[in-house]
Amino acid sequence: MEPNTVIPKYNVRGFEIWGFRDMAQVLDHLLGSGPVKTGTLVAMNAEKLLKAEDDTALCELIKNAEYLYADGISMVRAIRRKYPQAELSRVAGADLWEALMQRAGQQGTPVFLVGGKPDVLAETEAKLRAQWNVNLVGSQDGYFTPEQREALFARIAASGAAIVTVAMGSPKQEIFMRDCRKFYPDALYMGVGGTYDVFTGHVKRAPKIWQNMGLEWLYRLLAQPSRIRRQLKLLKFVGYYYSGRL
């Protein structure tokens, strides 16, 4: 990234979205020269924005995160409509996580994984080590009790992890990251949803051509027709888009 480059932020419905130009700019900003940036990464799309508007606690969690990025094509298009001069690209959460892991492997950055089923987590660890030689300093599957949370926070802190990725779904992962950061603020936290499942092949992602056309949502809908109710809720965001209420 060029020296002194200022990355713009764009306000959509009260949420400040970072306007990353491309994946390289994200990586250079977070893992460039010097220590890994600390803070929380949250993927933003239309569905999450609408959820946050209906859930005060989730809204506060998201707004307190340092790095909100445009994960969905809906968010990118909304920003471009409101800010015609904006130069930003979609940064898919699954792609960002893989890119972070690859860069972490190259730099020897310590990583701690949280969430997922035990077998999926084990496969994720094995693949990360084999593919990018990632320095994994600890892990915990998603099956732990509320009483075990503080012990897990202590393990994460003791590991010295610089990156902590949490696959628990929203809003559980945002709550976990907030609470863990109070105990151990010296890391970059990233909520990754079902990314471990995709990475290990347990869940099939849309082909690249669908992704590049911004139609990943349609691919998922065709694969899982039960998602139709979730998609219909997005009509509210379409209303924001066309009525100038972004």
From Swiss-Prot:
It is an enzyme of class 2 (transferase). It holds the Pfam family Glyco_tran_WecG. GO terms for biological process: enterobacterial common antigen biosynthetic process. CDD domains: Glyco_transf_WecG_TagA (cd06533). InterPro entries: UDP-ManNAcA_Trfase_WecG, WecG_TagA_CpsF. It comes from the Bacteria. Keywords: Glycosyltransferase, Transferase. Its EC number is 2.4.1.180. It catalyses: UDP-N-acetyl-alpha-D-mannosaminouronate + N-acetyl-alpha-D-glucosaminyl-di-trans,octa-cis-undecaprenyl diphosphate = beta-D-ManNAcA-(1->4)-alpha-D-GlcNAc-di-trans,octa-cis-undecaprenyl diphosphate + UDP + H(+). GO terms for molecular function: lipopolysaccharide N-acetylmannosaminouronosyltransferase activity. Pathway: Bacterial outer membrane biogenesis; enterobacterial common antigen biosynthesis. HAMAP family: WecG_RffM (MF_01001). Catalyzes the synthesis of Und-PP-GlcNAc-ManNAcA (Lipid II), the second lipid-linked intermediate involved in enterobacterial common antigen (ECA) synthesis. Belongs to the glycosyltransferase 26 family. PANTHER family: PTHR34136, UDP-N-ACETYL-D-MANNOSAMINURONIC ACID TRANSFERASE (PTHR34136:SF1). This is UDP-N-acetyl-D-mannosaminuronic acid transferase.
